[in-house]
Amino acid sequence: MEPVVRLRGVSKEFPGVVAVDGVDLDILPGEVHVVAGENGAGKSTLMKLLSQVERPTSGEIYISGERVEFHGPGHARRLGVAMVYQEFALAPHLSVAENLFLGREPGRGGFVNRRAEKEEARGLLRRVGLEVDPDRLVSSLTVAEQQRVEIAKALAIDARVVIMDEPTATLAEKEIEELFEVIRDLTSHGRAVLYISHRLDEIFRIADRVTVMRDGKVVATLPVEELDEAKLVRLMVGREIGNLYPKPEAEIGEVLLRVRGLSRGERLKDCSFEVRAGEILGFAGLVGAGRTELARAVFGADPVDSGEIELEGRPLRIRKPQDAIEAGIGYLTEDRKGEGLALQLGIDQNITLASLPARLGFIGLGRERSIAERRREQLNIRTPSVRRKVQVLSGGNQQKVVVARWLETRARVLFFDEPARGIDVGAKAEMFALIGELAREGRGIVLISSYLPELINMCDRILVMRDGRVAGVLEREEFSEEGIIALATGVKETV
């Protein structure tokens, strides 16, 4: 079978860095070809070379047997290569139909035929399983719906290759399965899907072949049936990794945090739960179910209408995050770059930021550096200096800086909101080992995740949310993906 895309000896160099190093790759019509590897392996740069966002330093790229010269992303789209980015390239204040045909509007003589545009848009949306009005503004759509619009854009240009960069990063399990159905439909019509992912289980669910990159090079391309999880991880990181989800043998003690009847408008409705010392409590649910909203409400980041919070039997009055921090509650936000870190500050300053009130707002530079060095060693934060700005760190190391900050506050209860999102498999293993160690120390942990294997493997109990309410709490012996999804979607009644 003739490859729809062929790369031969493709390299990309930036000042001081070889991001892609002599890559050979064939992509076949009708296949899902996963590109896997740790952060910094070269996956995203390779996708940018294919979609002509970046110009290769050397090497040759062929599409349908024709050698391609670099002329930019518009040229790549005309050749039938479409890219669906993690951060969608949609105009939020235009309608769905306008986004689908932006720059290619149907009509004559400078006049747009809106009726034809809407009719064609409906057909494209049906093909990706999206039942929305083409006149709706993109800004009113959910993340999952916007992603479908991006895929419909690829169909609108009759793309032969659709590149998807971490497409499930912000999707719940039900939405992931719906996306996979769309992908299977694309490949059944002869289109190739080039798919970047960190998530091991979904690689085995969706891939036909897997190319593994490490340090800018291709280390293997194999049919998925020739791989298992251990072999794939070994190829990705170049070493053995133990259990990715090391369930801690922690002694579960008395109730640390008790929340009763927490409500906030339509977002949270009479939510109650408990977290015990040494326990990892999971929060599961679809996107928008209220998991993050509940954590933010307990932390004082969002106001509540009613409810009670107790820590170690003491009633708390939490009106702002500072109240929660002083009481001993920490929250590691899912948006570490937007809310969790001061990117322009050094690692040392970020680590001591939340604990300054306990030090009356003052800390000497020597003491600050000493604290940061201790946490760097404890958490294996990879950096030549704690004075470096946080923005230059990898996602996994940035996440460790956030953890170090909360350890410095001596928090008794820690909320981890999507702690593994956007970090590679090696960093994930370290992150979950750390969460387990914190539980063994007797802290109460709340783990919020859209990725059910994380919750099922790490948690002692799982609280499932639906439409702002607690739909049920499952004990460990009751865990199953089907049971969690049933509660989250309302197929199963509240328990």
From Swiss-Prot:
Chief location bin: membrane
Keywords: ATP-binding, Cell membrane, Membrane, Nucleotide-binding, Repeat, Sugar transport, Translocase, Transport
EC number(s) per entry: 7.5.2.7
Main EC class the enzyme belongs to: translocase
Keyword Cell membrane on entry: yes
Binding site for ATP: 37-44
Free-text function comment from the UniProt entry: Part of the ABC transporter complex RbsABC involved in ribose import. Responsible for energy coupling to the transport system.
Summary of subunit composition and partner proteins: The complex is composed of an ATP-binding protein (RbsA), two transmembrane proteins (RbsC) and a solute-binding protein (RbsB).
Name this polypeptide is given: Ribose import ATP-binding protein RbsA 3
Organism listed in the record: Rubrobacter xylanophilus (strain DSM 9941 / JCM 11954 / NBRC 16129 / PRD-1)
